């Protein structure tokens, strides 16, 4: 499997990397969050820009990113606009979604960009090309907040993401039962054994919490923890998360 190196973080080796989302609505709130995250043991910061009140103003988005980067100069930043259809805060046109992501990928200030799988393939490929030209890694994602698809479907989506050029394919699904969590873990194990790229998977909510902890066992390269406000159901406090990941890593 290829390792994916972003600044001082290597995905695809050792314990899953910890990503903590920033969900501030204003520049002031984001700066406060960034200062707080500076004190926390994490690997990646995800800027969930769909929470930002001025997200439709690209000049203001870039200015906010400058402020975040000034506070976190060495921390890998994952830039994510989560669309409403995948559980995000805001519905925007496809045209704006791609303009936003392509513009920010070209700033030199982000390290990874989230690209949702279920869009026009030509648009997705263009965004991947723009990202890679600017040395930005692509987290290609899909989120199902209603259910856990069949194992074959989870495997198919992750495999498709890699085929399109994702550096880090990602899927998050909602369990209705413990069996659904096993389905996600089984799919993760199957894909990680044959994939060329590290993958990121999770089963959400309380039922799925084991999937956020057991990535090193089943093959998920990153997990999401909460420092203040969780951006998705089931995220664990980042300090507790590091403790458990370290505990499991020592057994390997």
UniProtKB/Swiss-Prot annotation:
Alphabetized UniProt keyword annotations: Amino-acid biosynthesis, Aromatic amino acid biosynthesis, Lyase, Schiff base
Organism domain of life: Bacteria
A GO molecular-function annotation: 3-dehydroquinate dehydratase activity
Main enzyme class: lyase
Residues binding 3-dehydroquinate, per UniProt: 46-48, 82, 212, 231, 235
E.C. no: 4.2.1.10
A biological-process GO annotation: amino acid biosynthetic process
Pathway: Metabolic intermediate biosynthesis; chorismate biosynthesis; chorismate from D-erythrose 4-phosphate and phosphoenolpyruvate: step 3/7
Annotated InterPro entries: 3-dehydroquinate_DH_AS, Aldolase_TIM, DHquinase_I, Type-I_3-dehydroquinase
Active site: 143, 170
Reactions listed under catalytic activity: 3-dehydroquinate = 3-dehydroshikimate + H2O
HAMAP family membership: AroD
Described function: Involved in the third step of the chorismate pathway, which leads to the biosynthesis of aromatic amino acids. Catalyzes the cis-dehydration of 3-dehydroquinate (DHQ) and introduces the first double bond of the aromatic ring to yield 3-dehydroshikimate.
Record note on quaternary structure: Homodimer.
PANTHER family associated with the record: 3-DEHYDROQUINATE DEHYDRATASE (PTHR43699:SF1)
Protein family according to the UniProt entry: Belongs to the type-I 3-dehydroquinase family.
Name recorded for this polypeptide: 3-dehydroquinate dehydratase
Organism field: Listeria innocua serovar 6a (strain ATCC BAA-680 / CLIP 11262)
């Amino acid at each position: 499997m290829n390792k994916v190196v972003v600044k001082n973080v290597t995905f695809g080796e050792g314990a899953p990397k910890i990503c903590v989302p920033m969900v501030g609505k204003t520049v002031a709130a984001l700066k406060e969050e960034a200062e707080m995250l500076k004190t926390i043991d994490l690997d990646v910061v995800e800027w969930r820009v769909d929470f930002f009140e001025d997200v439709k103003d690209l000049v203001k988005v870039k200015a906010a990113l400058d402020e975040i980067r000034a506070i976190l100069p060495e921390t890998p930043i994952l830039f994510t606009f989560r669309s409403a259809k995948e559980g995000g805060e805001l519905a925007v046109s496809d045209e704006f979604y791609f303009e936003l992501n392509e513009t920010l990928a070209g700033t030199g200030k982000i390290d990874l960009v989230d690209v949702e799988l279920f869009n026009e393939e030509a648009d997705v490929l263009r965004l991947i090309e723009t990202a890679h030209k600017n040395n930005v890694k692509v987290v290609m994602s899909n989120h199902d907040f209603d259910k856990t698809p069949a194992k074959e479907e989870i495997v198919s989506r992750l495999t498709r993401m890699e085929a399109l050029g994702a550096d880090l394919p990602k899927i998050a699904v909602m369990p209705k039962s413990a069996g659904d969590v096993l389905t996600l873990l089984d799919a993760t194990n199957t894909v990680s054994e044959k994939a060329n790229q590290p993958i990121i998977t999770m089963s959400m909510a309380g039922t799925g919490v084991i999937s956020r902890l057991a990535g090193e066992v089943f093959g998920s390269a990153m997990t999401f923890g909460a420092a203040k406000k969780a951006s998705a159901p089931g995220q664990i406090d980042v300090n507790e998360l590091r403790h458990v990941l370290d505990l499991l890593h020592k057994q390997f």
